[in-house]
Amino acid sequence: MPNIIYIDGKYSNYEDSKIHVNDRGYHFGDAVYEVIVFNKKIFYDFDSHIERLFNSLKSLEINFSFSISSLKLIIKNLIKMNRANIGSVYIQVSRGISERNHSYYGLNIKPILTIIITKKSNIDINVKGVRAITL
């Protein structure tokens, strides 16, 4: 289980972190996520995952202002804080917090970035996965 996560601009203890009840990701699944595996602090296909994250955010018209370099810095800090050598990085960007309403057009909503590091004892890259369709 992760110890330190990054949520809405702050590093926080996993047990103390909270998601606002009016987060659109909570109500409507109005969010994008990516999972990146790392082994000995080397990321598996980092650029492709980040490119897909940004493409998905753009497709959903989520106005995300973080740069790739700032995301990578946060991720590296979390890996160090959690003393993880092998594991996965879960990145989620929700549209943000607003009153419960199906429409988000015309609202000034700040996206919420959450990053969680999950430590693993071993990752077998030869395990057969499943097919998925991505944007």
Task: Show the residue positions of the predicted features.
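Conserved alpha/beta cores of soluble small-molecule-handling proteins
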Residues: M1-L135
